[in-house]
């Protein structure tokens, strides 16, 4: 009787270990999918402008550029948009090209174009650009190289951020 019980107990422990391993693997997967900044494949990302014309992202990134992925249903994104607009209106911000990308419908994107005056482009799904969490922003130098990327809100008026931009401009 005790032999049967110990085999059953060992089997339960094995199943428990497998479940823990599965949970750990799922956690690692979720972390890397949703909490890390994906690489920006500028030549493979095709966006749509307000006229319905398709563009490769690499065609839109001239000079120093900020590429910003957002959505209208994202609270942190909506909180950040006025801060970006304020930064864009500074002398430093006027020297940077901004590209906003969303998966919102065209009518929703138009509301934000009109409200903020942003260059907003659309993707059918942000996951087509390997973006699974938003907001996510990329700062590109004049050679189209990503020099800064972050998931979440940026502090657009932070001195360190402004110094980083000034370094790129010089």
Model-identified regions with their sequence ranges:
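Short, polar loop motifs at secondary-structure junctions
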Residues: 103-107
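Thiol-/selenol-based redox modules, centered on thioredoxin-like
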Residues: 142-170
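Short, internal strand/loop/helix patches
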Residues: 99, 110-143
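Short pre-active-site segment immediately N-terminal to redox-active cysteine/selenocysteine motifs
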Residues: 63-65, 69-73, 133
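Conserved redox-active cysteine motifs that mediate thiol-disulfide chemistry
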Residues: 69-86
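Short helix-capping segments at alpha-helix termini
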Residues: 90-95, 116
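N-terminal targeting signals for export/organelle localization
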Residues: 1-48, 170
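A short beta-strand-turn-helix
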Residues: 44-65
């Amino acid at each position: 009787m005790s032999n049967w019980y110990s085999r059953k107990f060992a089997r339960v422990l094995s199943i428990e270990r497998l479940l823990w391993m599965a949970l750990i693997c799922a956690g690692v997967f979720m972390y890397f999918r949703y909490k890390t900044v994906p690489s920006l494949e500028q030549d493979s990302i095709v966006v749509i402008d307000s006229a319905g014309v398709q563009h490769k992202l690499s065609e839109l990134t001239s000079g120093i550029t900020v590429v910003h992925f957002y959505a209208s249903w994202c609270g942190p994104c909506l909180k950040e948009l006025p801060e970006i607009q304020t930064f864009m209106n500074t002398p430093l911000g006027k020297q940077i090209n901004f590209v906003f990308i969303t998966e919102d419908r065209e009518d929703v994107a138009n509301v934000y174009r009109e409200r903020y005056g942003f260059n907003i482009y659309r993707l059918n799904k942000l996951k087509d650009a390997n973006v699974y969490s938003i907001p996510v922003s990329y700062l590109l130098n004049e050679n189209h190289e990503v020099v800064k990327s972050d998931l979440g809100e940026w502090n657009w008026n932070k001195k360190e951020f402004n110094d980083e931009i000034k370094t790129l401009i010089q």
